[in-house]
Regions:
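Conserved, mostly hydrophobic/aromatic
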Residues: 62, 110, 128, 139, ...
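N-terminal pre-domain/capping segments
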Residues: 1-111, 115, 119-134, 331, ...
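A general structural detector for well-ordered alpha-helical segments in enzyme core domains, enriched
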Residues: 58-61, 91-98, 131, 135, ...
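Active-site acidic/histidine proton-transfer and metal-coordination neighborhood
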Residues: 53, 117-217
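Active-site beta-loop-alpha junctions enriched in small/polar residues
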Residues: 48-52, 75-77, 112-114, 152-154, ...
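Alpha-helix N-cap and loop-to-helix initiation/capping positions
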Residues: 83-91, 119-131, 157-168, 194-202, ...
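Histidine-acidic metal/acid-base catalytic patches
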Residues: 5, 10-11, 17, 23-28, ...
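Acidic (Asp/Glu)-rich catalytic clusters
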Residues: 38, 60-67, 86-108, 135-143, ...
Length: 385
């Protein structure tokens, strides 16, 4: 039987009109926000860049290295802030404007290394929650797309308790915040000590307890390999992806940290190496970057970002690693973003002829004399060149 409809008076003529309770409130449909400009399905290759001196300078560094994405720290990663660690509104606006001008994206921020949301020690836990809250505030002010977080270490606590503490800490840190388009990514770990997150099931448990937050996963190749997942063979990579999909879900892997490993398979020791110079090997990275289940596509976002966290043992290693990834995905120098020749985060590389010219200039200044100091009381004899 149809429910009886209420009657209401027509305000124009007083006649009674049928009235349905469901008509009381019909909210306007919420428009789906347009995706960021960088989500165009193209490859996004980035590198962790330095914020020393000027945080906006990190953007120029990424562009000069030939990257179209980047990762940064938003503050010192190995220090607790002594006071306010907020970024001034003017600086944040300048950063956002510069990033838009360079067309870089996504912007990934890595959290402070000292944060340990799994700590059973009360003071450390309180400090970590506050620091993670500050990370969220800074990331949102800079317009970041992702905040990558190390889960933490239980330091003797049961794994289930450590996971519960991590999830609760994240929720507490984000309470009352407007995160905008920011998504928190839990990074897998190598399994050193009591670190949480070396098994995908552990990361899934964190995600299952933070469903009220925008969450995702950052998959680190070195950590994956060091934790015992063999990604160096075609069969091993397939098995690893088969382990990821039913747990955290490949559709929630938004960022991959692309690092070779200085330590062997299953070492549980976190040591990054330059691409092709470690135990994973260049060929394995080519297979991984071109895998249809990991490459840019409509899974989750319009594309994934591949971010380098490789060491700079000599000037130019950073630029060479970026170029190596572009080569591995089959994008040549002409198609990839143009890198500035000789640029490095450490210092600009000097060409052989430049070093020779510098030595000649030093000889002219020193008169060709040795570096030893002249004896006191004796006058130096200048030699004509």
């Amino acid at each position: 039987m149809e429910p009886a409809l209420k009657k209401m008076a027509d305000p124009l003529n007083g006649a009674e009109l049928p009235y349905d309770v469901s008509d009381e409130y019909r909210p306007e449909p919420v428009p789906i926000p347009a995706p960021p400009a960088w989500q165009d399905g193209s490859f996004r290759i980035g590198i962790h860049t330095s914020i020393a001196g000027d945080i906006a300078g990190a953007l120029d560094i990424a562009a000069k290295l030939g990257a179209n994405a980047l990762q940064i720290f938003s503050a010192s990663p190995r220090m607790w802030p002594g006071g306010s660690s907020r970024i001034a509104d003017a600086d944040a606006a300048r950063f956002r404007g510069r990033r838009a001008g360079l067309g870089l994206g996504p912007l990934v921020i890595h959290d402070n290394y000292l944060i340990n949301l799994a700590s059973p020690e009360r003071v450390m836990r309180t400090r970590s929650i506050q620091a993670f809250h500050d990370e969220l505030v800074r990331a949102a002010s800079l317009g970041a797309d992702f905040l990558v977080a190390h889960p933490g270490a239980g330091l003797g606590a049961e794994m289930s308790q450590a996971i519960e503490d991590i999830a609760q800490g994240m929720r507490q840190a984000a309470r009352g915040m407007k995160l905008g388009g920011l998504r928190i990514l839990v990074e897998n770990t190598s399994g050193m000590g009591s670190a949480v997150g070396s098994r995908f099931e552990e990361i899934k448990a964190i995600l299952d307890q933070t469903t009220d937050l925008p969450m995702g996963v950052c998959l680190d190749t070195a950590h994956t390999f060091e934790a015992g997942y063999d990604i160096t063979t075609e069969e091993g990579l397939e098995k690893t992806l088969d382990a990821v999909d039913p747990t955290v879900g490949l559709d929630r892997v938004y960022v991959l940290h692309v690092n070779d490993s200085k330590t062997p398979l299953g070492s549980r020791v976190d040591r990054h190496e330059n691409i092709g110079e470690g135990h994973i090997g260049r060929k394995s990275f080519g297979r991984l970057l071109n895998h249809p289940r990991l490459g840019p596509g409509p899974q989750g976002l319009a594309g994934r970002a591949f971010i380098l966290e490789t060491p700079i043992d000599k000037p130019g290693d950073d630029r060479r690693n970026v170029r190596a990834l572009w080569e591995l995905v089959g994008i040549g120098v002409k198609q990839a973003p143009k890198a500035e020749e000789g640029f490095s985060m450490t210092r600009a590389e000097k060409k052989p002829f430049a070093r020779s010219a510098e030595k000649t200039q030093k000889k002219k200044v020193s008169g060709g004399k040795s570096k030893g100091k002249a004896r006191k009381g004796k006058k130096k004899v200048k030699t004509r060149i």
